[in-house]
């Protein structure tokens, strides 16, 4: 029987969870931290707010948001991989944060009422879901009117030369890094496939608008290796 994308992705992240953080830094040359900081600066996150971090993984962004909003705010991190959440919970404990809750759940059907969160974030997760539009609509649904979505993910560079280097790196080098550092050649081969198939920046911005978001914009990082898209849920008239 053919394995669904959801089943395949779940299997990948359950296996690579122990080495995920180290591999993130190896693959991106630690640039993922810089990209997240650039995004946070542009978000202008307010203290004491309510945040949902979708596909939170090992909770890097959940922790950054929790530190930014302060003890009066609250962050809920959601992921469908229990093994990734286990790593994340240890990191939250080490950071001594009491305003973070990590829960098991599916981004395709967020277990929250409409209009629940001031901010929704998703970092390097959208490309791995079975249906991009379904997840975008779900994130729109749970945002409060006036709330903001920020999505960081890999993208498609269009600079001649750099595009070819980027594609070759993800296709040939990244799986080898996965084998060497994490004994996971097959899993990192899959991750480069999901990167290659993910929509480019302009198309993803259109999808944000189709899902209902307003004031959509995006910035590229490192020559288009990744991008952050921002969108707002319009305030009720």
Swiss-Prot record:
UniProt pathway annotation: Quinol/quinone metabolism; menaquinone biosynthesis; menaquinol from 1,4-dihydroxy-2-naphthoate: step 2/2
Record flagged with keyword S-adenosyl-L-methionine: yes
Catalysis performed (reactions): a 2-demethylmenaquinol + S-adenosyl-L-methionine = a menaquinol + S-adenosyl-L-homocysteine + H(+)
Name of the molecule in the record: Demethylmenaquinone methyltransferase
Family per record: Belongs to the class I-like SAM-binding methyltransferase superfamily. MenG/UbiE family.
GO biological process, one term: menaquinone biosynthetic process
A Pfam family assignment: Ubie_methyltran
SUPFAM superfamilies: S-adenosyl-L-methionine-dependent methyltransferases
GO molecular function, one term: methyltransferase activity
Keywords tagged on the record: Menaquinone biosynthesis, Methyltransferase, S-adenosyl-L-methionine, Transferase
Gene that encodes it: menG
Keyword Disulfide bond attached: no
EC number: 2.1.1.163
Taxonomic source organism: Listeria monocytogenes serovar 1/2a (strain ATCC BAA-679 / EGD-e)
NCBIfam families in UniProt: MenG_heptapren (TIGR02752), MenG_MenH_UbiE (TIGR01934), PRK00216.1-4 (NF001243), PRK00216.1-5 (NF001244)
CDD domains, alphabetized: AdoMet_MTases
Source species, domain of life: Bacteria
Biological classification of the source: Bacteria, Bacillati, Bacillota, Bacilli, Bacillales
Enzyme class: transferase
Chain positions recorded as S-adenosyl-L-methionine binding sites: 58, 79, 106-107
Its job: Methyltransferase required for the conversion of demethylmenaquinol (DMKH2) to menaquinol (MKH2).
InterPro entries: MenG_heptapren, SAM-dependent_MTases_sf, UbiE/COQ5_MeTrFase, UbiE/COQ5_MeTrFase_CS
């Amino acid at each position: 029987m053919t394995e669904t994308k959801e089943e395949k992705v779940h299997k990948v992240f359950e296996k690579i969870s122990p080495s995920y953080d180290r591999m993130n830094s190896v693959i991106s040359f630690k640039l993922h931290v810089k990209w997240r900081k650039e995004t946070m600066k542009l978000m202008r996150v307010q203290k004491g707010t309510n945040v949902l971090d979708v596909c939170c993984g090992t909770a890097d962004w959940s922790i950054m948001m929790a530190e930014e909003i302060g003890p009066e705010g609250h962050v809920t991190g959601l992921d469908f991989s229990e093994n990734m959440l286990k790593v994340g919970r240890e990191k939250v404990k080490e950071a001594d944060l009491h305003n973070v809750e990590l829960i098991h759940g599916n981004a395709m059907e967020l277990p929250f009422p409409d209009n629940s969160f001031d901010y929704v974030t998703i970092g390097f997760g959208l490309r791995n879901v079975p249906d991009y539009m379904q997840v975008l609509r779900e994130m729109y649904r749970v945002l409060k009117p006036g709330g903001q979505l920020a999505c960081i993910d890999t993208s498609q560079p269009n600079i001649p030369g750099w595009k070819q280097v980027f594609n070759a790196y993800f296709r040939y080098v990244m799986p080898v890094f996965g084998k060497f550092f994490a004994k996971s050649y097959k899993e990192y081969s899959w991750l480069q496939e999901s990167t290659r198939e993910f929509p480019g920046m302009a198309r993803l911005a259109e999808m944000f608008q189709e899902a209902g978001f307003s004031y959509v914009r995006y910035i590229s990082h490192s020559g288009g290796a990744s991008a952050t898209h921002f969108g707002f849920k319009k305030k009720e008239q």
